[in-house]
Amino acid sequence: MKKYIFLALAISVLACKNKTTPAIDYSQETLDVTTSIYPENITKVFGAHGGLDTWNGMKSLEFTMKKLNGDEVTTTNLKNRKSLIEMPHHTIGFDGEDVWLKNKDTATYKGNPKFYYNLMFYFYAMPFILADDGIIYEDVAALEFEGQSYPGIKISYESGVGESPEDEYILYYDSETHKMTWLGYTVTYFSKEKGKEFHFIKYNNWQTVEGLVLPETLTWYNYENNLPTEKRNDLPFTDIKLSKEEPDTDMFEAPAGATIID
């Protein structure tokens, strides 16, 4: 009798060992996995604007700014940040190493090309530009404005990052939608010292392009004691073009007659 029991157990164990477990095709499964390397609050802001995966899939951004002296068209390679700004009287470019200026006529460019070549791109590409390497995030007090409270995230840079590592930004967002609403920023390019005054831009007019929620209008505000006061001016953006194809690299090279900016 014991022999029969032992034989039955052996057959049972062998059957279990030979049993095949069906493979699961995880490509067809929806997995709840958190992979963000960013703080939760800024991750939610990115998500409210279409998500970093969608942004990172794009290689080219072009936008037009409507200005009093004529349209200004900016094209940027999103992967290497080479850029080209076409203005009525001038062209500014960045080839990855040097900033250059080309005059189209006798009009003198009165700005600073090295300061300006990526300035409006940074403002326009918010909040995604705040996912760059070398950034430090910190929660700060909410901005109280006209009866509304906007949670804040302070952005600073590690030493040696960019032309102005002393720059600081504060992104304020809607606590319900997590969409960006305000940007506070300092300007340190000229002084090379940490700024004490925050300037303010309001982001409250959006448009969806290729699945990404991008600004349609930026509104600058006057400021006092590091707070926005009254509206100063609007700057509309039109003809937004996002592409998964890289722009022609030759367009960023300095043409004949251009001046390299030191």
Language-model features and meaning:
Residues 101-167, 191-194, 251-261:
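Flexible, processing/modification-adjacent segments and terminal tails
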Residues 12-15:
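C-terminal motif of bacterial Sec signal peptides marking the signal peptidase cleavage site
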Residues 17-19:
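Bacterial signal peptide processing site
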Residues 2-7:
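Sec-dependent signal peptide recognition
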Residues 57-64, 78-85, 146-154, 180-182, ...:
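Short, hydrophobic/aromatic-rich segments at coil-to-beta transitions
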Residues 25-27, 33, 37-108, 141:
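N-terminal mature ectodomain segment of secretory-pathway/periplasmic proteins
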Residues 151-252:
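Gly/Pro-enriched, hydrophobic low-complexity segments
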Residues 48, 136-141, 201-203:
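Short structured motifs
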